Amino acid sequence: MKHYDFHPLVGVGLRTPHLDFFQQQRPELSWLEIHSENYFQPNAAERKYLHTLREQYQISCHGIGLSLGSVERVSQVHLAQLKALIDAIDPMFVSDHLSWSENGGHYFNDLLPLPYTEEALNVFTRNVLEVQDYLQREILIENPSSYVKFQHSTISEWEFLAEVQQRTSCRLLLDLNNVHVSAFNHGFDCNTYLSAIPADKVDEIHLAGFTIKQLDKGEIWIDTHSRPVSTEVWKLYQHWIEQYGPRHTLIEWDLDIPAPEVLLAEAEKASLLLSQITTPLSATRKAS
């Protein structure tokens, strides 16, 4: 395998097609991120792979199923499965999304948008607090990609996210590709969003690629995680870490998954940018 120069803060998303590669080749990354729900079954083959990889790598658990924006409380079954996974592998981060996916006992296989209202804020913060109390740890909340807006929203997404953090003391997962995609789709400035997010509460950054879909009246950008990180998102990332300091940084790739070497080359790009930052990580995170 080619030699790569990885910064210790850089990781990649571990996906099923790459399990054998990581098991056999063991690239010298410090950490990997998994989709939590894929590893809930303790006797599944994927879980056995994970325990073996955990001997070398730190693991971050990134969830898509807590449905923190649902009026109904978070599923106790889901929470119990998540806690069992956490107890088994001791992850460095546990995260989920600013979204909802369950209503009336029906689960939707997507991360659906919230109206940014006081009512939705109360529901979301209640659910985050309940999850953190159950897990006995802070979780990270990720900003979503967005394609629709609710007319009755009363505040912006970035104000909503900042208020969630303030009320719950959760940490933040900043997805810069999502900011870039949503900024185009809704016509706001990325810097407006990023300057409103409390940088000292950001523990992790996600980088990924997007696709452009042509419509009758223009185009829409879609956060598909199926392409290399775009030049514009690399620039956003460089600007952010130069301003606020280094963070744990993940390369995501979920569709049209390439050879693992392509993923590792993206991780090496992030490593190069991080290596140019002189501010230590400890100096960028203030006490909560």
From Swiss-Prot:
This is UPF0276 protein VP3015. Belongs to the UPF0276 family. Gene3D superfamilies: Divalent-metal-dependent TIM barrel enzymes (3.20.20.150). InterPro entries: MbnB/TglH/ChrH (IPR007801), Xyl_isomerase-like_sf (IPR036237). The lineage of its organism: Bacteria, Pseudomonadati, Pseudomonadota, Gammaproteobacteria, Vibrionales. It comes from the Bacteria. It comes from Vibrio parahaemolyticus serotype O3:K6 (strain RIMD 2210633). Pfam families: MbnB_TglH_ChrH (PF05114).
